[in-house]
Design a protein with these regions (language model features):
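Donor-nucleotide binding loops and adjacent catalytic segments primarily
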Residues: 52, 187-283
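Conserved nucleotide-sugar phosphate-binding/catalytic loop shared by glycosyltransferases and other
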Residues: 31-75, 85
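A donor-sugar binding/catalytic signature common to diverse glycosyltransferases
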Residues: 100-101, 108, 149, 273-317
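A nucleotide-sugar donor-handling region in carbohydrate enzymes
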Residues: 7, 41-43, 145-221, 373
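Active-site and donor-binding regions of nucleotide-sugar-utilizing enzymes
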Residues: 7-8, 14-25, 65-167
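Nucleotide-sugar donor-binding patch of glycosyltransferase catalytic domains
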Residues: 299-344
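Short acidic-hydrophobic, aromatic-tinged amphipathic segments that line or gate anion-handling sites
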Residues: 63, 151, 171-173, 268-270, ...
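C-terminal amphipathic helix plus adjacent low-complexity
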Residues: 338-379
Length: 379
C-alpha cells in the first residue's frame, strides 16, 4: 500500500482535507498517516485536534510547534520548530507521499522538511494569488517543491504550468472543501443559539478577518477602522477569531473589546468548528472580512460577501463578492444587502465546485508514480 502522510495545522485546512481523509482511510491501495500541528494543538484556537479524533481519524503524531507571541519572529520560530520535530516524524513514518494543502507557514515547514528528505509532495490549491499576504510567496514556494499538483480552477492549473511544472502532473480537481459543505449536517438556529448562548438576530453578518501579513504594521489601525464602520450600520455580527499569523492576537483583542460594549448585538467566538461555522454561514445574511472562506465556500450558500482590503487580491471569485477598501465598507455592506444583489447571488454557481474533487485526488494518488525528480517545463 502507498503510504500518504497528511499534515494539517489548522481547522480550515482540515475542512479541505476531510473528504480526502475519509477516502484514503477506506482505500485498499492507500494507507493514511495523519500528523497534526500548530493551531490544532493550541488552547487559544480551540484544540481542534479533538474534532479530528471525534470524526474517527487516528492521529499518528502531534507536532506542538506554535510559539504564540506578538513578535514578528514568532511564525518563523514556529516554522523552524515544526521542521525539527517533523524530521523525526517522517523518519518514523517513512511515507511514500506527503500531502499538503495551501499556504500556511507550517505548511511551508512541512514541505521544506519533506523536500530535503527526498519525499515526494502532493499539493492542493496551488497557483492561486493573494497579494496582500505572505501566504502568496509561501504557496508558490510549495508549488516548486511539489511533484504533483491539484488545483481548484483551470486558471490556477495554467498558472502552475506557467511556473515550470509538467502539465501531466497538474490536475484541476476543484476545491475539496465544497464536498465537506455539501455533506454537512447543518445545525438549526435554535441549537446554535443554545450552543453559543447568544440569540441570533434576524439580520446578521458572519465576520472573519485575518492579518495582512505583507503589511503587518497596518493591522491594528485597520481593524479599529473596520469596527468603527460596522458600528454605524444596523446589522448584528458574529465575529470569529483571527488566525495565529503575526498581528492576529491584536485583531482578536480589539474584536473582544468591541463585542463587550454591545454583547446583545455582537458575539465573538474563538473557534466554531466546521459544522457550526458552515451552519452559521448558511443562516447569515452577509459574510464580511478577508478570509478565503468568503471567496471559496460562501458561494455554496449564494451569500453576498464583502471582501475587505488586499489579503485576497488576485484570487478568482464569483459575482457574489464585492471587493472594497475600508473607507467604502459601509457603502459595500449596503449594496451587498440590497434586494437586487441578494437575488443576483441566488442565481450564481460556485466556480470552485467539482463534484468529483476528492475522487480525482485519490485516483491520481493511487495511479500516478510520484517522484521527486523534476524537469522545468518550458512554455
Amino acid at each position: 500500500m502507498k503510504k500518504i502522510c497528511v499534515i494539517t495545522g489548522c481547522r480550515s485546512e482540515y475542512g479541505i482535507f476531510y473528504p480526502i481523509l475519509k477516502k484514503i482511510a477506506t482505500s485498499k491501495k492507500l494507507k493514511l498517516q495523519l500528523v497534526v500541528s500548530t493551531m490544532h494543538l493550541s488552547n487559544e484556537f480551540g484544540l481542534t485536534y479533538k474534532k479530528i479524533e471525534y470524526d474517527g481519524f487516528k492521529i499518528d503524531h502531534k507536532i506542538d510547534n506554535l510559539i504564540s507571541s506578538p513578535s514578528i519572529s514568532s511564525n518563523s520560530k514556529s516554522a523552524g520548530l515544526a521542521m525539527i520535530l517533523l524530521s523525526d516524524v517522517l523518519i518514523n513514518l517513512k511515507p511514500d507521499v506527503v500531502l499538503l494543502v495551501g499556504d500556511r507557514f507550517e505548511t511551508l515547514a512541512a514541505a521544506s522538511c519533506a523536500m530535503l528528505m527526498n519525499i515526494p509532495i502532493a499539493h492542493i490549491h496551488g497557483g492561486e494569488i493573494t497579494e496582500g499576504s505572505v501566504d502568496d510567496k509561501v504557496r508558490h514556494s510549495i508549488t516548486k517543491m511539489s511533484s504533483i499538483h491539484f488545483t481548484s480552477t483551470e486558471a490556477y492549473k495554467n498558472r502552475v504550468i506557467q511556473m515550470g511544472e509538467d502539465p501531466k502532473n497538474v490536475i484541476c480537481s476543484g476545491a475539496p472543501a465544497i464536498e465537506s459543505i455539501l455533506n454537512t449536517k447543518f445545525i438549526s438556529k435554535k441549537i446554535i443559539e443554545k450552543k453559543i448562548s447568544w440569540k441570533i438576530n434576524n439580520q446578521f453578518a458572519l465576520f472573519t478577518y485575518h492579518p495582512e501579513t505583507i503589511n503587518p504594521q497596518s493591522n491594528k489601525n485597520n481593524i479599529i477602522k473596520i469596527l468603527d464602520h460596522i458600528k454605524k450600520t444596523s446589522i448584528s455580527v458574529i465575529f470569529t477569531s483571527s488566525n495565529c499569523d503575526t498581528g492576529g492576537d491584536e485583531i482578536n483583542y480589539h474584536l473582544k473589546q468591541f463585542v463587550s460594549k454591545d454583547p446583545n448585538r455582537y458575539f465573538y467566538i474563538e473557534n466554531l468548528g466546521q459544522d457550526y461555522y458552515f451552519s452559521i454561514m448558511k443562516l447569515a445574511n452577509l459574510i464580511i472580512g478577508n478570509s478565503s472562506s468568503g471567496i471559496i465556500e460562501a458561494a455554496c450558500f449564494h451569500k453576498p460577501v464583502v471582501n475587505i482590503g488586499n489579503r485576497q487580491k488576485g484570487r478568482i471569485h464569483g459575482e457574489n463578492v464585492i471587493n472594497c477598501n475600508i473607507p467604502n465598507l459601509n457603502k459595500s455592506i449596503s449594496r451587498a444587502l440590497s434586494l437586487d444583489f441578494v437575488n443576483h447571488c441566488k442565481k450564481l454557481n460556485n466556480i470552485y465546485y467539482n463534484k468529483n474533487s476528492s475522487d480525482i485526488i485519490i485516483k491520481n494518488l493511487i495511479n500516478t508514480e510520484i517522484s521527486t525528480k523534476k524537469s522545468f517545463y518550458n512554455l
